[in-house]
């Protein structure tokens, strides 16, 4: 039944590619099958990505907040019957308390906006079964290094200006840049709670529908796709990601207090 709902929603426009005012793979490639087993798809009135960090917990972007969530795990293709596919509801969501609530609603980006703390935990209705196609990924323990090679993934739009969603999970290789590159690019605030990643000549970027997905640098989960330029993949406009190393204590506290 969930497959039919997903197909109809995406095909007939019942789900938007991303929450209003936010981004979030352009210039990427089809991920190798089961190479990103921690990647999840979150279906509500929007399409977002997420990351399995514990059998019972998914981390995503706070701007993906909704009144309901359907979580798809173990997926490579959203529209094919796959052996590792699992489906879960969400018992409770925990947006970061310092993320501004009005940014969760219909909001057009304004000069000076601060999207810090764009992080949310989802408690699954029942634990995911850990298999070859569904695995957890550890939280970071060290600061990421500027210049690191990073990989972002998602089912978001592959065209900067149009809503063109792929069937298959897409990956893109980008580099971690200094935050100064994003400060120069945007009128919105870029803080030390964020990471700046992309290519300065454009061509490669996360885009609409990739929000909440992973940014993995040198093999370590370091970021969650948050926001960026519209259209995506423009020169001198890298993507902006939530910096997870700044939030590990909060994440662990929420998980401990809500077993």
From Swiss-Prot:
Peptidase S1 domain sequence ranges = 25-256
Modification after translation, per record: Probably N- and O-glycosylated.
EC numbers listed for it are 3.4.21.35
What Pfam families does the record tag this protein with?
Trypsin (PF00089)
Q: Which residues form the signal peptide?
A: 1-18
Q: Does the keyword Heme apply?
A: no
Ordered alphabetically, the record's keywords are: Disulfide bond, Glycoprotein, Hydrolase, Protease, Serine protease, Signal, Zymogen
* CDD domains assigned: Tryp_SPc
State if Transferase is listed as a keyword: no
UniProt-annotated glycosylation sites, renumbered to this chain: 91, 106
Catalytic residues per the record? Answer: 63 (charge relay system), 118 (charge relay system), 211 (charge relay system)
Positions of disulphide bridges: 31-171, 48-64, 150-217, 182-196, 207-232
What's an example of a GO molecular-function annotation for this chain? serine-type endopeptidase activity
Record GO cellular component, one term: extracellular space
Biological role: Glandular kallikreins cleave Met-Lys and Arg-Ser bonds in kininogen to release Lys-bradykinin. This protein may be involved in the regulation of renal function.
Protein name from the UniProt record: Glandular kallikrein-10
Q: Which organism is it from?
A: Rattus norvegicus
């Amino acid at each position: 039944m969930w497959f039919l709902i997903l197909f109809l929603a995406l095909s007939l426009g019942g789900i938007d590619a991303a929450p209003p005012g936010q981004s979030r793979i352009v210039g990427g490639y089809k991920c190798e099958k089961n190479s990103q087993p921690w990647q999840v798809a979150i279906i509500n009135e929007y399409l977002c990505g997420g990351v399995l960090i514990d059998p019972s917990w998914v981390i995503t972007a706070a701007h993906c907040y909704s009144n309901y969530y359907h979580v798809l795990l173990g997926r490579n293709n959203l529209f094919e019957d796959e052996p590792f596919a699992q489906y879960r509801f969400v018992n409770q969501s925990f947006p970061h308390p310092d993320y501004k609530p009005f940014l969760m609603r219909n909001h057009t980006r304004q000069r000076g906006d601060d999207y810090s703390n764009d992080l949310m935990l989802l408690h699954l209705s029942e634990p995911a079964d850990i298999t070859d196609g569904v695995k957890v990924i550890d939280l970071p323990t060290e600061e990421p290094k500027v210049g690191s090679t990073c990989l972002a993934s998602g089912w978001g739009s592959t065209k900067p200006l149009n809503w063109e969603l792929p069937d298959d999970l897409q990956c893109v290789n980008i580099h971690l840049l200094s935050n100064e590159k994003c400060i120069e690019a945007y009128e919105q605030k870029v803080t030390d709670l964020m990471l700046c990643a992309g290519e300065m000549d454009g061509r490669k970027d996360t885009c609409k529908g990739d929000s909440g997905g992973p940014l993995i640098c040198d093999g370590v989960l370091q970021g969650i796709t948050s926001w960026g330029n519209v259209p995506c993949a423009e020169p001198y406009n890298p993507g902006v990601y939530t910096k997870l190393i700044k939030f590990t204590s909060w994440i662990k506290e929420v998980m401990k207090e809500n077993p």
